[in-house]
Amino acid sequence: MAVGKNNNKMGKKGGKKKAVDPFSRKEWYDIKAPNMFNTRQVGKTLINRTQGTKIASEGLKGRVFEVSLGDLNNSEADFRKFKLIAEDVQGKNVLTNFHAMSMTHDKLCSIVKKWHTLIEANTAVKTTDGYTLRVFVIAFTKKSVNQVKKTSYTKTSKIRKIRSEMIGCIEKEVTGCDLKEVVSKLIPDSIGKDIEKTCSKLYPLQEVYIRKVKIIKRPKVDLGRLHDLHGDSITVGADGEKVDRPDDYEPPVQQEV
C-alpha cells in the first residue's frame, strides 16, 4: 500500500446547516402594571411564537418582573422594588399583579446605625380576597429629647413589647383589606408610619419601614378581578378591531397567489 497523502477528499455526510437567527422565532409582548401605579407600561418581554402545542401566552403566565417603584410612579428618589407576576395575556399585553416587595440593599445599609438597637418583626396575615402575605418590618431606636447619653439601647423586655405592637399594627392594617388596598398602603409606606406612631409610647423609634412583603399563598386567578385592575389595558378580543376605511375603498388586487 502506497504511503502518502490521499487527495480524494470525501465530503462529510450532510451539508453545513444554515445559521438561523433565534430572534426570528420570537415576538414581543408589553408588560402592563396594575392601576395602583402611575406608569402602566413598564417594559417588554420576549417569548417564542406559538408552534404546535406550545402556546406563547401559556409560556408567559407565571413570569415575574422586578420594577423599581421610582419607575412605576415617576419619582426619582425611591428605594423600594416591586415584583409583578404575569397572570393573563390579552392580545399583546401581559396583565400582571402584585407578587412581592423589597427594599434596595443600598437603603438597608444606609439606615443601619451604631449605638442604636435594631428591632425586626414579621408575621403572616391573610387578606379578604384569600392571599396570605408574610410582612417584615424593621426599626431602630431613637435618642429621646435632651438625651446626653451617647447610646440609645433598650431592654430585651421592651423589645418584645415593641415587636408585639408591630405585629398588632400589621394585622390591623392588612387583615381587613384586599390585595389592591394593601399595595396602595405599601406605596407611601403608611403602615411603617403607623407603627412608628404606635410604638413611640414604649420607646422612641426612627427609620421604621416595611422591609419586605412576599406572598406565601395565593388563591386561584380571578380573571374578573384581574381585568378590573387593568381596565384600560385590555385589548380587543377575538372579534377584532374596527378599522376606519373610506366608503369607496377597494382592497388591492393580488398579482400572485
Curated annotation (Swiss-Prot):
Keyword rRNA-binding appears in the UniProt entry: no
GO BP, one annotated term: translation
Biased-composition ranges, Basic and acidic residues, are 239-248
- Listed InterPro entries: Ribosomal_eS1, Ribosomal_eS1_CS, Ribosomal_eS1_euk
Listed A to Z, the keywords are:
Cytoplasm, Ribonucleoprotein, Ribosomal protein
Q: Does the keyword Methyltransferase apply?
A: no
Q: Which Pfam families match?
A: Ribosomal_S3Ae
**Domain of life where this protein originates:** Eukaryota
Q: Which GO terms describe its molecular function?
A: structural constituent of ribosome
Family, per entry: Belongs to the eukaryotic ribosomal protein eS1 family.
Known partners and oligomeric status: Component of the small ribosomal subunit. Mature ribosomes consist of a small (40S) and a large (60S) subunit. The 40S subunit contains about 33 different proteins and 1 molecule of RNA (18S). The 60S subunit contains about 49 different proteins and 3 molecules of RNA (28S, 5.8S and 5S).
Record-given protein name: Small ribosomal subunit protein eS1
